[in-house]
Curated annotation (Swiss-Prot):
Disulfide bonds: none annotated. One of its GO terms (biological process) is aromatic amino acid family biosynthetic process. Homodimer. The active site is at residue 71. This is Shikimate dehydrogenase (NADP(+)). Its EC number is 1.1.1.25. Pathway: Metabolic intermediate biosynthesis; chorismate biosynthesis; chorismate from D-erythrose 4-phosphate and phosphoenolpyruvate: step 4/7. InterPro entries: Aminoacid_DH-like_N_sf, NAD(P)-bd_dom_sf, SDH_C, Shikimate_DH, Shikimate_DH-bd_N, Shikimate_DH_fam, Shikm_DH/Glu-tRNA_Rdtase. It comes from Bordetella petrii (strain ATCC BAA-461 / DSM 12804 / CCUG 43448). Involved in the biosynthesis of the chorismate, which leads to the biosynthesis of aromatic amino acids. Catalyzes the reversible NADPH linked reduction of 3-dehydroshikimate (DHSA) to yield shikimate (SA). NADP(+) binds at residues 84, 132-136, 226, 250.
């Protein structure tokens, strides 16, 4: 680990972490806002998250972005100092020191909502299909509900996991104006179609799409994949074939959640748009 730096020190911690675009994103935010910082990657052993965080703190570290597989451990580390979003998600992707203690928030869902709004989606009263019932899905439920979605239907290959997520959400203190239901992948349809379909699975990393029935999309609906790539993902291609008016990948969500973390740490909200444009160009150039 590097020596203490005179600059405010931040990092992304995970395993693996070499692929992370967070250093590039936060460097651009730093230049944009005039907030100087040092931002690095921290590779933690799978069984060494707490020790790596402690060493980072002892060397002057002030804040961390947390990626797989440590988001649940980060939630435990922050203990009683969790935001409402983090409490409902059961996971933390942003840590910062305040009054000698680690505080935690989950900015993933805010990143998704901000990108959906950037794309012109009207979430107030929207019907949303959420595909997947893991941590990625759990992390976006509260922000989607808070944005005014009328219904969120969770479907998963294991229907029981979807039902468990919906039940846990209700038990944790759900947003009462949003109806949250669950079922199997085959139960993904709804009369009139969905306004937004979000793929919260990692299927696109394997070049596959979830096994969804046809006829899912309302007119002008958006299909959104949390994964991102230089070209449309398997889920995006499936959605276009099924009649989705528009598709988008998760690069904007990545930049959006990073912008929210930057705001928490530095008290200023950066503009995600030029950063997203630069990252997209980088993706295409490497293709």
């Amino acid at each position: 680990m590097s020596q203490a730096s005179p600059l405010p020190r931040y990092a992304v911690i995970g395993n693996p972490v070499a692929h992370s675009r967070s250093p590039q994103i936060h460097a651009m935010f730093s230049s944009q806002t005039g907030k100087p910082l040092q931002y690095e990657r921290l590779l933690a052993p799978v069984d060494g998250f707490a020790a790596t965080v402690q060493a980072f703190r002892e060397q002057g570290g002030l804040g961390l972005n947390v990626t797989v597989p440590f988001k649940e451990e980060a939630c435990q580390l922050a203990g009683a100092h969790l935001s409402e979003r983090a409490r409902l998600a059961g996971a933390v992707n942003t840590l910062w020191l305040r009054d000698g203690a680690w505080h935690g928030c989950n900015t993933d869902g805010v990143g998704l909502v901000s990108d959906l709004l950037r794309l012109g989606v009207v979430l107030e009263g929207a019907r949303v299909l959420l595909v997947g019932a893991g941590g990625a899905a759990r992390g976006v439920l509260q922000p989607l509900a808070a944005a005014g979605c009328a219904r969120i239907h969770i479907v998963n290959r294991s229907a029981q996991r979807a039902h468990d997520l919906a039940a846990g959400w209700a038990a944790a203190g759900a947003v009462p104006g949003t109806r949250v239901t669950a079922g199997a992948l085959a139960e993904a349809g709804v009369a009139g179609g969905w306004n937004v379909v979000v793929n919260a699975t990692a299927s696109s990393l394997q070049g596959a799409a979830p096994e969804l029935p046809r006829g899912l999309y309302a007119p002008d609906a958006l299909a959104y994949d949390m994964m991102y790539a230089a070209h449309p993902t398997a889920f995006m291609r499936q959605a276009t074939d099924d009649g989705a008016a528009r598709t988008a990948d998760g690069l904007g969500m990545l930049v959006g959640q990073a912008a929210e973390s930057f705001l928490i740490w530095h008290g200023v909200r950066p503009d995600p748009s030029p950063v997203l444009t630069a990252l997209r160009a980088t993706l295409l150039a490497k293709d």
